[in-house]
Curated annotation (Swiss-Prot):
Protein name: Large ribosomal subunit protein uL16
InterPro entries: Ribosomal_uL16, Ribosomal_uL16_bact-type, Ribosomal_uL16_CS, Ribosomal_uL16_dom, Ribosomal_uL16_sf
Organism field: Shigella flexneri
Function, as annotated: Binds 23S rRNA and is also seen to make contacts with the A and possibly P site tRNAs.
Originating gene: rplP
PANTHER family for this protein: 50S/60S RIBOSOMAL PROTEIN L16, LARGE RIBOSOMAL SUBUNIT PROTEIN UL16M
């Protein structure tokens, strides 16, 4: 699963997920899966969607993952009283704003790409849409 090799600090503030996304265009492949909603994707969700797409295209074409989980989420154990410091890092998330391209695919027909992205979208907690590369 995806997570940073090393970070400057182990734990992070909760913060807010506001603003608009960068990386809104299909840059590498021909088709993309773009986020319509706002939220956060865990490393497990990113990997589950990648596996669903890979199975659908049966190793033809190429898939690019455009998001990386770089924010640590901490949790305190069950039945532990409040206080006594911040909990341990349990998983990593990527914050997603509307318009962000999450995955890209190239070297496959459009119908196959649509089907693969549909399977991947079912694994994700945010609303997504299918986009194609725009040539200026």
């Amino acid at each position: 699963m995806l997570q940073p090799k090393r970070t400057k600090f182990r734990k992070m503030h909760k913060g807010r997920n506001r603003g608009l996304a960068q990386g809104t265009d299909v840059s590498f492949g021909s088709f993309g899966l773009k986020a319509v909603g706002r939220g956060r994707l865990t490393a497990r969700q990113i990997e589950a969607a990648r596996r669903a797409m890979t199975r659908a295209v049966k190793r033809q074409g190429k898939i690019w993952i455009r998001v990386f989980p770089d924010k640590p989420i901490t949790e305190k154990p069950l039945a532990v009283r409040m206080g006594k410091g911040k909990g341990n890092v349990e998983y990593w998330v990527a914050l997603i704003q509307p318009g962000k391209v999450l995955y890209e695919m190239g070297g496959v027909p459009e119908e196959l790409a649509r089907e693969a992205f549909k399977l991947a979208a079912a694994k994700l907690p945010i609303k997504t849409t299918f986009v194609t590369k725009t040539v200026m």
